[in-house]
Amino acid sequence: YLQTKKKKNEFEKLLLASAGPYLEQGERAAAEMKASSYEKLRQRADEEGAVCHGEFSQHNILLENGRGETAVNFDKWNFDLQVADLGYFMRKILEKHGWSERAAERILNAYSARRPLDEGEIETLRLYLSYPWKYWKLANRYYGSRKSWISGRNTEKLKTLNAQQADWLRFVKGSFF
């Protein structure tokens, strides 16, 4: 649709111009996930009844003065690998910190101190972080929306995402994991 559209707005031009690297990385991550131990891990998680928050970010964690932490807003809970919540959390934090390997290491060390990850979970986390979730979300929202009006906020999000692309790809292809 977008390629044949004659008059494109700024968002559409940006979306189309930036699609290549995100599609390539998404296909690579999906193929690697399919070839990984993800399905075995997921089956094990199903048998154990593992529950995920579904939207585990810093906004959904309450720190209670010396009494610990509380997770809130379980609207998107689901049955899945718990490492999916860690991946979501890390992605949100790393986007705000330039995909810093140091920040990733600190998060992973803190998590592992309470719940160590096995090799398959670490590989799943790496693949989760290498998928272009934010680009997919913006493209999917565009595809499912009225095309006559595009939110300026989405255009800004796409510009920010494209500006962070090199840092993200460096992190994904780097030696962190």
State the predicted function of each range.
Residues 135-177:
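ATP/Mg2+ or Mg2+-diphosphate-binding catalytic cores
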Residues 39, 127-128:
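Short acidic/histidine-centered micro-motifs embedded in hydrophobic/aromatic stretches
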Residues 83-116, 129-147:
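Active-site activation/catalytic loop segments of kinase-like enzymes and analogous catalytic loops
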Residues 32-82:
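Active-site acidic catalytic loop and adjacent metal/ATP-binding pocket
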Residues 1-51:
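ATP-dependent phospho-/nucleotidyl transfer catalytic cores
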Residues 117-121:
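Helix N-cap / loop-to-helix initiation motif
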